[in-house]
Amino acid sequence: MKKRILMQGNEAVVEGAIRAGMRFFAGYPITPSTEIAEQSAVRLPQEGGHFIQMEDEIGSMAAIIGASAVGVKSMTATSGPGFSLKQENIGYACMAEIPCVIVNVQRSGPSTGLPTSPSQGDVMQARWGTHGDHPVIAISPSSVEECYMLAIKCFNLAEKYRTPVVFLLDEIVGHLREGVEIDDEQPIEVIDRRMKERPDTMHLPYHVDEGEDVPRFHLTGYDIRYNITGLAHGEDGFPTNNNEIAGALNTRLMQKIDKHVDDITSVEEYKCDDADTVIVCYGGTKRSVMTVVDTLRAKGEKIGYFRPITVWPFPEKQLKKVAAHAKRILVVEHNYGQILYEVERIVKDDCKIDFLGNVKGTVITPAEIIKKIEEVR
């Protein structure tokens, strides 16, 4: 049945996650993500799932790893301070290849910062927060409807590539209320984990079949031991000191993402085809930027915006294509310039790059963006 529901971004995340098959949530209340825990506590029992409020953020991350390891699609939610506490176990999930979704509704920092104010200060942390080289997928929605649809995508990518996925909201989008059209009867792609089918590899939980990059999941609850560790390990899942095996594992963990960037990444390009000025934005910042583009287009200016929906891995190919015909790129972020570094790395030789940031906990307004455009002309 098709219905249009007024809901908050945080609530839409829960509904999308449940549609994707999420049946376990472990979390600890923290502004501005608390509504995700509250909604999960109500909705999961209705769907045969389980909600647990953990003693802290560290335990929350550990709990969803454990639930996912035995086959239950799992999610947690937090904000900046809690995201910091989760980093060690996020690395564990990367190494053990345990699919899960971590929602980070960003708020102004550092430290406790401004708990109810918007920020995009955790973008680099989503990429580099845990130690060592590790695979990363991070997705950033800009509307309540995207909170619903992209939550499904987060789970699909987590299951397909056996990796934690960060759903990187900001306070603007998390607390935004909009109408969302939901059709429970319309088919939506939901990817479930692939299980081992070859008996000869059942005792090798990390064996990768020829031509594949991701090991199929071991059937748990049977008479075959399934060892999970954060240490470098061989196909049998047991720790190894063999440098060649450890190197091959680390390479595969990275390549299973790098080789499939085209499948993972998605962008939105708005009026970029003939644009002399392209604004790069993401998340809630897009809402002010879209107003700017429409306003200046009405005055005859050639301007558009490029929005990475997948912020990690960054959509390099798509950005280079847009920058090839642009004269100027303006990066607009609620931070001191984090995606700015990626933009400069990728297209600094193709066009002029300017930046507008905000770290005082207020929304970047269309007027501020237009003023910046006029200043750098």
Walk through the language-model features, giving the residues of each:
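Short, flexible turn/loop "capping" segments at secondary-structure junctions
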Residues: 128-132, 271-272
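Flexible glycine/proline-enriched surface loops and loop-helix/loop-strand junctions
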Residues: 132-135, 234-235
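Structural motif
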Residues: 75-77, 101-103, 138-140, 166-168, ...
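Thiamine diphosphate
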Residues: 1-128, 135, 152, 171, ...
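Flexible, glycine/proline-enriched loop segments at strand-loop-helix junctions
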Residues: 134-146, 163
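Flexible, low-complexity linker and terminal segments
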Residues: 3-10, 162-377
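Short amphipathic alpha-helices within nucleic acid-binding modules
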Residues: 147-151
